[in-house]
């Protein structure tokens, strides 16, 4: 983009933004407090798993179900081999959100210098589980676990770089700050009338 990005009227828009939160996670917004209320009300808990059966269940019934419900035919997913390779390599972890004995959601934690939420999903992409606080739990429980492990920051992963993007807006309720962006993007050149 260097040839295109040359003037004061040129604007670079990255495809993806990365955001982080400070740990311990503090619920200061009305939305975050409501998420925590739902988690407590429904007595959601979490567990970490490396069990192959749990990985397959998460991949098929949470991750794929969620992205296919959200993106339908345009969904592009990682293969199970790629997914399980990332989870089983290094110290990466699958965190499952549970209601009783049922895993209702999950998120993969990439255990880097600043641990990162990689992919998440809700069982059967269920709105019932969403209303129970499953989405908030995929942020709250990793933050709780990482705080207990001594981490001071957690990456919330990538979001589209448009401020009206729903995922980016959701992350704002947890007081995130933008910590980086993709090198891939587009350049907008502002033209003048001739």
What are these regions (language model features)?
Residues 5-130:
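A conserved beta-strand-loop-helix scaffold within acyl/acetyltransferase catalytic domains
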Residues 95-193:
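Aromatic (often tryptophan-rich) hydrophobic motifs at membrane interfaces
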Residues 1-41, 159-194:
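Terminal substrate-recognition subdomain of acyl/acetyltransferases
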């Amino acid at each position: 983009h260097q040839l295109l990005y040359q003037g004061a009227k040129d604007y670079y828009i990255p495809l993806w933004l990365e955001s982080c939160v400070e740990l311990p996670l503090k619920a200061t917004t009305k939305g975050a407090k409501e998420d925590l209320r739902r988690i407590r009300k429904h007595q959601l808990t979490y567990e970490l798993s490396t069990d192959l059966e749990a990985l397959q269940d998460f991949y098929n019934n949470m991750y794929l179900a969620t992205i296919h419900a959200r993106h339908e035919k345009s969904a592009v997913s990682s293969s199970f081999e790629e997914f399980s390779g990332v989870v089983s390599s290094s110290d990466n972890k699958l965190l499952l959100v549970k209601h009783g004995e049922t895993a209702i959601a999950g998120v993969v934690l990439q255990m880097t210098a600043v641990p990162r939420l990689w992919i998440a999903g809700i069982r059967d992409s269920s709105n019932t589980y969403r209303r129970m606080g499953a989405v908030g739990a995929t942020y709250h429980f990793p933050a709780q676990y990482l705080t207990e492990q001594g981490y001071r920051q957690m990456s919330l992963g990538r979001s589209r770089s448009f401020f009206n993007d729903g995922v980016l807006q959701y992350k704002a309720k947890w007081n995130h700050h933008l910590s980086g962006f993709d090198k891939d993007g587009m350049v907008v050149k502002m033209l003048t009338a001739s």
